[in-house]
Amino acid sequence: GGAVGADLAAADGALASGDGAPVVEILPVGLWLAPVRPSVCQLTVCAPGADFTTGQAMERNALIYAASTHTVVVRPRFRVGGTWTGAVDALRRRLGTLLVAGPPSDRAVATLVALGGVPLASVADMPAALMVEAPRPQPSLFGGSAVREPVLAFG
């Protein structure tokens, strides 16, 4: 994701794994405002000097879901904020597999799982969760290709 918190920790963990796999961050700000991370490919849809805005963060979240086979959602709040909105939108449009981290008793976690997310109670569950395939998009009634809505721009 490229934002502070869980996004930054995930990128740092991927770098620390030492397997040489590329690490990509999709930033919610312009490249001029992001700290330079030489081992990371940083992408943004923002102008180079653009500050953080909620709309740009929402657009960035939609791109992350659309580009990923699996996405981990951490600490969703029930019906509040960009994490919730992006997760529900990704589930509705079947954009990859959504892994939902948190206690099953949490209302937001339970709801996202009920909507099709995969529960991720602990890090130990990650290998099994990554084996879960995303639901296939519904075939079109008129041409054989899959129905897939465009990624929405929130900015």
Q: What are the roles of these predicted feature ranges?
A:
Residues 1-155:
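Glycine-biased, small-residue-rich flexible motifs in mid-sequence functional cores and linkers
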